[in-house]
Structure formats: structure tokens, C-alpha cells
């Protein structure tokens, strides 16, 4: 492996830990240089191989991409896609570089010679097994799948080869007594073993249950928790995995009672016998697809062979799939769009499909387009963010010679479709042969197998205002829009979307309650809102109340067990629950934990250890941690924690008062009577003020809720919320002063960047700023009862902080909003602490501003931390000042410009607020 020579006169001011390995030393130097550039004088004194890129060095997802690109340039190698996504420490990067191949430009692949036209689809087949056997018997040597590697090389899999491998897998499963009605979990990547194991499971008469594979070591506990929920619901008897995931799979086996065996896919197959394939009924289960965003009670969509074939055939009829079509997909096979919409659809119609890893696309989006070019592909589905990613992340130099002229349908679905994305993608790639009518917005969901509506072929996307048409129902399917009573509404009247047809699930696996809730008179409730216009369905948003925090599920019992393992906390004496914050309507995660420690210092140390433990395991910090004495957590006579009762006691203020009173009575009553008496007036005033605030919020909160629910979406709801915030602050005695309003732009989009020090910051900004702006909030706020409703109705944007692919899509959506003229407000710190100090700023806001060419306006909030600091329940009156700074205009579109703007804004806010900068984010992560 050839590497560049690292100069001893590096511009980095950080020292690097001694290393005997040149690769490790080089990695440390590149990392140190980037960290110095990001954090300047506040950077850590040294970079070591085992520091966390994110927690210790402040290198988030955006910064990581920049770091990895620099490493590739410095070492002259090409890093593997998986290594790029999974690296958590400099040592991981060094190992990946040591194993990397020398860099070579990814040469555009030469177009493949077209295959001979396929044969007609098996219209008489009743099951997926019959479909594969039909093709394997009639044309066993014909290529079914081209598996593309990172370097663009491909390996062909024929129908006959897939059938033979599936038979061998089926024999391996039968040897393990797996048969009809059993479930088999597939924790496999988008690779060849998935194909054979999926059909081998069906050939054994069992039901495949796809699970997404682990790929982030620092998220493994959360991953295990989610998969255990699915394994428990599905009652899978065998888990088929790959070598790198065996350790995780073994852990799952120990904690999933029904799971009898974990086996790597390469050790599952047995020499195929002549045993005939089972005769399966069309109504037999063919797949359990667990919906993304499942709650603590996972919902597995049970689909039969008849459901899947009906959906595939209806899609084929709607988009006129024929023997001359060729497909390309980078979608994961464990997701319904990649599994059913891409692979199984291509299988049924006998058309070749090129399949590549999702990581290959995310790392270098141009690979998708070059795969289309190489195969002269006509069909390729993808979520909306993929099209936007291509526009944003592919350079012109990567497109030389590209030809997309054969691409007749770009099926855009699986998430809301953006008119701006469609327009930009079409304009950008028109010179390369992409036609406007090739963009085909669709709508579907797991409960309908995958597809439900599709735009007519040959028609340009239809846009109504800013909403993109999702087309018309698939043949044989019906869709209606209804009011809350289930009555169909008129055209252009928004309502709930319901559907029925042969593709629709029979219900949720082992979850009759969820099944009953989803169906009404034969119609399945999608949980979405939309309207009809000129025969087209326009989907406007979600209605389902998905209980998700930061893209993951939080289970109280498991969180309590996690906290109970902290030394000094009484095991079994922990309560975790969520409470609504009446000040801003959001929900806070509260942990109440008993300890025998009595001193305030010891309890503060326990709080810090609990915070560290939860953040390390879950990636989401509790908003409030209460460490209290024995007997505080309420329980039933049998010893079960009464979370609701403990929550009520917490909300009523009985927990801290009870603890505080006992401590003061036992330790201070005799010695500090005089001091206690001197504090009584202040305490009485605080309690009286707290009671006053709680009283009017008890009245004002429900009023706001009702007004928000009744108000139209958009500006009307925004005005109501702003007026409510002004009224509440006035009633609370919080005098609000605003400075610098002359700096607000008269027109055009802008990025507002504000410091974050209290839960009051959001209502304060809504009350103070007359500018028309939209907040950019963390996605987990959508799960809270009131704030989630406000976010959706006003049109605030949300971003995913933990899921890489979704986070990229959200970031692109933010930039699109700015480009479209919307002003956005960010809290670049992302969180706040009780102690004063400006936390490190994340780059997201400044990246969006640079890409959109919008000015950044610093906004400083003073006073809210004193009025309602972190962990406080009772506010106190006081003045609040909001200062709007002068706009800062981006001077370019480079990486350094993002860093420059971030540093200038942070320095200005630090100066105006009077608070120093805090450079260690770990305590707030």
C-alpha cells in the first residue's frame, strides 16, 4: 500500500500520542489537524488511538465524512464502505487503512451487452416458490441477479443456481426440525446469502422474518433491545446470520427464549436431496415484515404468497413491466421496497436486476447511476432522499460519459416526495439522458405489501401547490379518504387514507389488538392524511402516534435495569417515565433512582454516572435524574414499580420535597434553625410563585391544545402558539426585551442560530421574534403529545440524530427548505446544561446556510437559564433579553466556510451572552 509522506511541519497544533506504526501515526496527524481546525484553541491537548471520534474529539457525522475523505487523499487508498460508516475511533480508521486497497478512480463501467428478452411471467403461479421453480425449470442458466461489489465488478446468479442453493438451505433447516408454521429470522446483509436463505426458508415451509443487521458498534445495546422485541413477537426458532455478527446473534439467542439456534448462512446449507418442494397454499404466510418505527410491542405485518403476488402483478400492470426491462437497486433486502418492490418483482417478471449494497450507494451515490448506465437499466426505485443526494453529492467530474437514456421509470417512494427534489434531479441529469416523465412518484406501506398507488407512466409528475401527486390506486385495489367518522370526503378535502385490496395484510402477527385497531369494515387505516384531486391521491402527512425517541424505542423496564446496575443505586428501586413539560408542551424523560447515599456531593456524582450510563447505552440523555432516599419509588405490594404513581408524585413535587424535607430535618434542623428561618421567606415566595405558574398553566395548557387542534395548519397555528407564548411569559412575570430587530432580513431566507440554556428558549423566541421562521427540531420531539402536534401543524422541520441514512435525508430536506425561501432557526448546541457556558456548536446549521447561500443571524438569549435551569421544576420570575446580531453572509461553499461561520457565530453569542465557552460536550451528549 502506498501512502503519502507526512510532513513534520504539520499545521496541527495538537500533539499526537507516540506510535510505532506509521499508519497509526499518520491517522493521528490527520485527525489532529481536523480537530484543530474544528475546535481551535479549545481542542484536546492530544489525540490518541482509542478516543471516541464523536464523544472525545467532537467529530460528528458530517465531520466524519470530511475526515475520511482526507484520509483517503493522504494515504492514497480507497476505504471500504463499511469501514467508513462503522469507524468509531482513530484505531478503527488505522486498521481500515491498513487493509485498504490502493486508490484508483472508479472507472465508468462499460455497458453490458443486452440479454436476450426474457420469457413471460408465470401468471398461474400461486406462491413465490412456484415462481422461482418455474423460471429455474424453463431457463436455469439465465441470469437473475447481478451482485455488484464496491469496485463495480459483478457476480451473476442464475435462476437455476438460486434454486439449487435454496434447496440446500431448506434441507439444512429441515435437519433442524424447522417446518410449516415456524419462523426463521434473517439477520443478513444485502448479499447473496440473503437470496438463498429467503427462498430456502419458504421451501422448508417456514416464514422468513428479515432483521436489519448491526453496523454500529456503539449502538449495539439499542440494536439488541429492538431485535429481542421482534424475536420475542415472531417466536423465531432459528436466526441465520453472517460471521461478523455471530457475537451479537449469540447474545440474542441467550435472551430470546424461543430461539433454539443461531447459525451462519454459509454453514446452513446441506447437500440438496431430491425431496420435492412443499405444496404451499396461496394463503400460506410468506413473510413477516416488521414495520419501521415499531413501538415496545413490535408490529409484524403478516403477508401471504397471495398478498405478495397480487401486489407484484398489480405493480407490473400499472407500470407495464415487460421482458425487455432491466432493474437496478441499492435498497436493503430487509426492507419491503428493496425486498418486494425490487428483487421479488424482478424475479416474478423474469427481468435481470443488479443489486448493490446500501452502504455502497450512501458512500458514493454515483455508483447507482453508473450501475444504471452499465445495464441500460429501465427501472429503479429509491426514496426521495436518494435523488436529492445525487444532486448534492455527485460532482460533474463523476458524470463524464454517463448515459441515463434507458431509465424509463425512477420510482420515487417510501417517504414523502419533494417537488423541489424532482425538479432539481430532472434538471441536473437531463444532459445525461434523464427525461422528466421518467420520474414516477409512488405511495405504499408495509400493510399493503409495498405499493398502493403509482403515477401513470409517460406523465410528468403532477404538483398541487407543494404537494406531489402519488398517482392512482393499483389495479384491483381501492383507496379512500375519510373523515374521523369513517365517511368518505369530497375532492380536495383532507382526511384519513384507508385502503383495501388483494395485497393487504390479514393482520399483525400475534397482535390481535393492533389488528382490530387497524381495520374498519374491511378497510385498513394507513395512519396517513391526504386528499383526492382530479383522480390523483395527494398524501399530506402522518397521523399515527409513533412512540419513537431519537429513532429508537425506549422501554422503561430496560432503562430501569440499566440504571439499577450503576454502583450506589438500589437495584429494583428505579422508576423511568415521561412527563409533559407545561412550559413548552414537550415531553421529558425522567429517571427517579433510590440510593443510600445522603450527601449532596455523593448524589451529584451518582447523577453524573447515571447520565453517562444511559447516554452510553442509549445515546439519549434523560432530561431529569432524581437521586433520592430509600422508599421514594412507589411500588405495589408484590414489589412491582408503580411508574404512574411515582410520576404523579413527581409532578406534584412530592418527591423532592419529601427527600429535601427529610434531609434538612435530619441533618440541619438543630444546627441551622436560624439559617432555615432566614430562608423561609424566599422559599415561601418561590413556592407561591410556583403555585401561581402551575395554576395558570393548568388552565392555559389545555386551551392551547384545543386551539392548536382546531386551527388550520401553517400560519394560523403559528400565530396562536406565538400569542400563547407571549401571554404565558407575561403572566409568569418574565419581562421580555428584544434588541437588534433592525438586523432581521426584509426578505429572503436566513438561518437563525441561537444559544440554548433552558426549556424556556423555544417559547421565548416565538414570543420575541416577529420574523417568519421555522424551528429545526430533533425528530424525537414528534412523539410528544402537544409539541409533536405543533411541529406537524406549523410545519417545523425535524432531523434524525442517530440513523445515518435518515439523518442525511433530513439534512438535505433542511437545505431544500432554505433554498425554497424558508427561514430556519437552529439550536447548534443541540442541548443545554444547568451550569452556564456555551457548548460546542454542531455544523448542521452552517452547512445548510453555506449550501443554500443564506446569511446566518446570531441570536443570543439571556436570562432563561436563571429562570428555569436544567433539572428545575419551579421557575422564578426575572427579565429575559433576546439580542439579534448582524447577519453573516457565506463567502463560499467550501468546508472551511462552514467552520468559519460556526466559529464567528459562537464567538458573537459568547460575547453577547457573557457566558464562557464549554468545550467538553461529553457531559451533555
Cite the ranges covered by each PLM segment.
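Non-catalytic C-terminal accessory region of glycerolipid acyltransferases
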Residues: 1, 651, 680-684, 808-925
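Conserved AMP-binding/adenylate-forming core of the ANL superfamily
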Residues: 145-196, 216-223, 279, 300-306
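AMP-dependent adenylate-forming
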Residues: 131-157, 285-288, 295, 444, ...
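Conserved AMP-binding/adenylate-forming
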Residues: 408-410, 417-537, 543-546
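Conserved pre-ATP/AMP-binding loop-to-beta segment of ANL
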Residues: 140-143, 270-290, 296-297, 302, ...
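Conserved AMP-binding/adenylation subdomain of ANL enzymes
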Residues: 309-326, 336-378, 393-398, 478
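AMP-binding/adenylate-forming catalytic core of the ANL superfamily
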Residues: 373, 380, 501, 506-507, ...
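AMP-binding/adenylate-forming catalytic domain of the ANL superfamily
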Residues: 78-97, 584, 615-640, 654-665
Amino acid at each position: 500500500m502506498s501512502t503519502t509522506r507526512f510532513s513534520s511541519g504539520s499545521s496541527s497544533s495538537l500533539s499526537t500520542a507516540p506510535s510505532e506504526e506509521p499508519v497509526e501515526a499518520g491517522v493521528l496527524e490527520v485527525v489532529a489537524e481536523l480537530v484543530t481546525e474544528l475546535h481551535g484553541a479549545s481542542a484536546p491537548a492530544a489525540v490518541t488511538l482509542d478516543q471516541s471520534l464523536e464523544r472525545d474529539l467532537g467529530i460528528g457525522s458530517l465531520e466524519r465524512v470530511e475526515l475520511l475523505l482526507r484520509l483517503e487523499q493522504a494515504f492514497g487508498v480507497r476505504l471500504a464502505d463499511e469501514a467508513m460508516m462503522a469507524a468509531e475511533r482513530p484505531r478503527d480508521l488505522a486498521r481500515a487503512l491498513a487493509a485498504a486497497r490502493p486508490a484508483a478512480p472508479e472507472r465508468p463501467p462499460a455497458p453490458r451487452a443486452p440479454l436476450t428478452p426474457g420469457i413471460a411471467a408465470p401468471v398461474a403461479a400461486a406462491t413465490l416458490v412456484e415462481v422461482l421453480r418455474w423460471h429455474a425449470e424453463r431457463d436455469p442458466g439465465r441470469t437473475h441477479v447481478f451482485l455488484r461489489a464496491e469496485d463495480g465488478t459483478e457476480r451473476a446468479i442464475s435462476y437455476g443456481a438460486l434454486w439449487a442453493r435454496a434447496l440446500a438451505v431448506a434441507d439444512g433447516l429441515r435437519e433442524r426440525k424447522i417446518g410449516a408454521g415456524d419462523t426463521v429470522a434473517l439477520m443478513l446483509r444485502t448479499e447473496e446469502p440473503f437470496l438463498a436463505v429467503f427462498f430456502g426458508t419458504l421451501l422448508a415451509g417456514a416464514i422468513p422474518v428479515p432483521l436489519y443487521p448491526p453496523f454500529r458498534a456503539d449502538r449495539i445495546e439499542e440494536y439488541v433491545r429492538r431485535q429481542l422485541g421482534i424475536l420475542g413477537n415472531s417466536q423465531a426458532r432459528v436466526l441465520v446470520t453472517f460471521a461478523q455478527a455471530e457475537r451479537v446473534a449469540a447474545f440474542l439467542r441467550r435472551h430470546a427464549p424461543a430461539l433454539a439456534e443461531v447459525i451462519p448462512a454459509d454453514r446452513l446449507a446441506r447437500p440438496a436431496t431430491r425431496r420435492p418442494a412443499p405444496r404451499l397454499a396461496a394463503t400460506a404466510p410468506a413473510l413477516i415484515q416488521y414495520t419501521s418505527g415499531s413501538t415496545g410491542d413490535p408490529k409484524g405485518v403478516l403477508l401471504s404468497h397471495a398478498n405478495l403476488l397480487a401486489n407484484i402483478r398489480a405493480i407490473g400492470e400499472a407500470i407495464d413491466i415487460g421482458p425487455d426491462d432491466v432493474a437496478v437497486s441499492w435498497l436493503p433486502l430487509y426492507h419491503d421496497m428493496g425486498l418486494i418492490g425490487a428483487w421479488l418483482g424482478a424475479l416474478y417478471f423474469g427481468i435481470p436486476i443488479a443489486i448493490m449494497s446500501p452502504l455502497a450507494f450512501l458512500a458514493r451515490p454515483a455508483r447507482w447511476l453508473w450501475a444504471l448506465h452499465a445495464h441500460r437499466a429501465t427501472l429503479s426505485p429509491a426514496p426521495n432522499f436518494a435523488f436529492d443526494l445525487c444532486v448534492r453529492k455527485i460532482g460533474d467530474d463523476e458524470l463524464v460519459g454517463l448515459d441515463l437514456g434507458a431509465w424509463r421509470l425512477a420510482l420515487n417512494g417510501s417517504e414523502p416526495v419533494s417537488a423541489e427534489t424532482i425538479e432539481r434531479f430532472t434538471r441536473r441529469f437531463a444532459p445525461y439522458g434523464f427525461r422528466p416523465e421518467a420520474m414516477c412518484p409512488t405511495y405504499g406501506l408495509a400493510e399493503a405489501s409495498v405499493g398502493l398507488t403509482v403515477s401513470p407512466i409517460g406523465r410528468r409528475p403532477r404538483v398541487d401547490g407543494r404537494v406531489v401527486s402519488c398517482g392512482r390506486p393499483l389495479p384491483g385495489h381501492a383507496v379512500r379518504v375519510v373523515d374521523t367518522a369513517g365517511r368518505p370526503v369530497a375532492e380536495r378535502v383532507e382526511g384519513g387514507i384507508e385502503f383495501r385490496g388483494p395485497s393487504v395484510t390479514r393482520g399483525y402477527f400475534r397482535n390481535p389488538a393492533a389488528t382490530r385497531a387497524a381495520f374498519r369494515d374491511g378497510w385498513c387505516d394507513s395512519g396517513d392524511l391526504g386528499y383526492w384531486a382530479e383522480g390523483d391521491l395527494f398524501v399530506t402527512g402522518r397521523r399515527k402516534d409513533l412512540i419513537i425517541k431519537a429513532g429508537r424505542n425506549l422501554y422503561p423496564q430496560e432503562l430501569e435495569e440499566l440504571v439499577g446496575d450503576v454502583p450506589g443505586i438500589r437495584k429494583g428501586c428505579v422508576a423511568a417515565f415521561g412527563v409533559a413539560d407545561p412550559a413548552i408542551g414537550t415531553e421529558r424523560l425522567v429517571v427517579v433512582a433510590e440510593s443510600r447515599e445522603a450527601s449532596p456531593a455523593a448524589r451529584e456524582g451518582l447523577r453524573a454516572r447515571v447520565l453517562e450510563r444511559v447516554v452510553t447505552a442509549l445515546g439519549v440523555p434523560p432530561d431529569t435524574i432524581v437521586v433520592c432516599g430509600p422508599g421514594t419509588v412507589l411500588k405495589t405490594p408484590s414489589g412491582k414499580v408503580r411508574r404512574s404513581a411515582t410520576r404523579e408524585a413527581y409532578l406534584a413535587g412530592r418527591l423532592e420535597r419529601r427527600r429535601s424535607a427529610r434531609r434538612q430535618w435530619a441533618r440541619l434542623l438543630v444546627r441551622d434553625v436560624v439559617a432555615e428561618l432566614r430562608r423561609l421567606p424566599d422559599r415561601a415566595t418561590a413556592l407561591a410563585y410556583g403555585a401561581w405558574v402551575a395554576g395558570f398553566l393548568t388552565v392555559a395548557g389545555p386551551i392551547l391544545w384545543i386551539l392548536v387542534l382546531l386551527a388550520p395548519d401553517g400560519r394560523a397555528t403559528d400565530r396562536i402558539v406565538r400569542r400563547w407564548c407571549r401571554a404565558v411569559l407575561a403572566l409568569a412575570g418574565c419581562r421580555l426585551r428584544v434588541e437588534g430587530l433592525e438586523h432581521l432580513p426584509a426578505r429572503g431566507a436566513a438561518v437563525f442560530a441561537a444559544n440554548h440554556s433552558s426549556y424556556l428558549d423555544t417559547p421565548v423566541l416565538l414570543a420575541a421574534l416577529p420574523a417568519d421562521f421555522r424551528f429545526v427540531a430533533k425528530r424525537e420531539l414528534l412523539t410528544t403529545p402537544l409539541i409533536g402536534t405543533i411541529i406537524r401543524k406549523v410545519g417545523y422541520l425535524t432531523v434524525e440524530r442517530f440513523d445515518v441514512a435518515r439523518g442525511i435525508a433530513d439534512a438535505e430536506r433542511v437545505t431544500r427548505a432554505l433554498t425554497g425561501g424558508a427561514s430556519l432557526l437552529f439550536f447548534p448546541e443541540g442541548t443545554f446544561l444547568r451550569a452556564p457556558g456555551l457548548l460546542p456548536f454542531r455544523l448542521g446549521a452552517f452547512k445548510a446556510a453555506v449550501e443554500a447561500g443564506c446569511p446566518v443571524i446570531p441570536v443570543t438569549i439571556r436570562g432563561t437559564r436563571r429562570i428555569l435551569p436544567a433539572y428545575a421544576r419551579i421557575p422564578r420570575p426575572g427579565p429575559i433579553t433576546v439580542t439579534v446580531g448582524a447577519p453573516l453572509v457565506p463567502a463560499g461553499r467550501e468546508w472551511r466556510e462552514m467552520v468559519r461561520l460556526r466559529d464567528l457565530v459562537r464567538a458573537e453569542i459568547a460575547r453577547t451572552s457573557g457566558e464562557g465557552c464549554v468545550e467538553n460536550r461529553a457531559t451533555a451528549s
